[in-house]
């Protein structure tokens, strides 16, 4: 009886271990996908910011001049 219980227990442990491994792989994949998505989003945001900056520079040249002066210090 005891050996049977032990075998069952080990079997469960092995199942849990294998499932855990698979879950970790999935999580890693998801994480990498999320990072890639975030990077893409950041690139899009940066592009938008650049466009906005260019527009603001055209509209408000005095603000950009002040910013440049601050950056020098």
From Swiss-Prot:
Domain of life, source organism: Viruses
The protein's name in its UniProt record: Putative protein p4
Taxonomic source organism: Acyrthosiphon pisum secondary endosymbiont phage 1 (Bacteriophage APSE-1)
Name of the gene this protein is made from: 4
